[in-house]
């Protein structure tokens, strides 16, 4: 915590990497499929990809995200681009400007779900989801929220799953209250290509059962 740094890394869900499957067996597949085998499989997959230790997780769905953002009293999301949500993301066509946007829970989820409005598709959606998480962290670490964090947690405790001990959360809150230095939240997105590397064309995808599926091959230098 001495660096006051939070690094948010976006890994495309369609990344074709070595994942942890049933009984700990490893094989190449899309990252999102690791989730079929539980949170631990997803954590192990990302640990192997980045060569780091991952101790904790937070798992939340769309309804939980709405509840968390609303419990915080809304958040500010800094959008890279201006766009309007389509029906796949939200029944309400929310419009977002480039720069700061004040969002309630429903707007934050719509912002995080949209992908058809962008030429970069899911890559931009991943960056938007990171921007939304950054907005949540900035609001959650503000003095106004920290001084009543117990009430906020109680309001959303059944909306997400985590293995972070309550004592650890309490220690982090006390640390932040004693040192009001704002966290330096940085974001980074893994880049890749949808074009198979040499020797991994349509026939290869047919063999692996991924022909016709959306697959991203991450750039090695982007991961490193």
Question: Model-predicted segments: where are they?
Answer:
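Non-catalytic, solvent-exposed segments at the cell envelope interface
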Residues: 1-224
């Amino acid at each position: 915590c001495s660096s006051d740094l939070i690094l948010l890394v976006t890994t495309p869900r369609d990344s074709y990497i070595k994942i942890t499957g049933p009984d700990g067996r490893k094989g190449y597949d899309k990252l999102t499929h690791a989730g079929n085998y539980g949170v631990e499989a997803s954590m192990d997959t990302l640990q192997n990809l980045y060569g780091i230790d991952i101790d904790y997780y937070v798992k939340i769905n769309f309804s939980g995200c709405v509840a968390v953002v609303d419990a915080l009293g809304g958040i500010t999301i800094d959008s890279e681009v201006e766009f309007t949500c389509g029906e796949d993301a939200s029944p309400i066509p929310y419009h977002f400007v480039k720069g700061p946007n004040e969002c309630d829970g429903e707007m934050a989820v719509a912002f995080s779900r949209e992908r058809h409005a962008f030429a970069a598709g899911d890559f931009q959606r991943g960056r938007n989801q990171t921007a939304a998480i950054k907005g949540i962290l900035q609001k959650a670490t503000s003095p106004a929220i920290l001084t009543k964090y117990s009430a906020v947690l109680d309001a959303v405790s059944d909306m997400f799953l985590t293995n972070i001990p309550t004592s650890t959360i309490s220690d982090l809150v006390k640390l932040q209250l004693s040192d009001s230095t704002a966290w330096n939240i940085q974001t980074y997105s893994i880049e890749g290509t949808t074009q198979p590397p040499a020797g991994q064309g349509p026939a290869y995808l047919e063999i692996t059962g991924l022909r016709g599926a959306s697959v991203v091959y991450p750039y090695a230098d982007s991961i490193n």
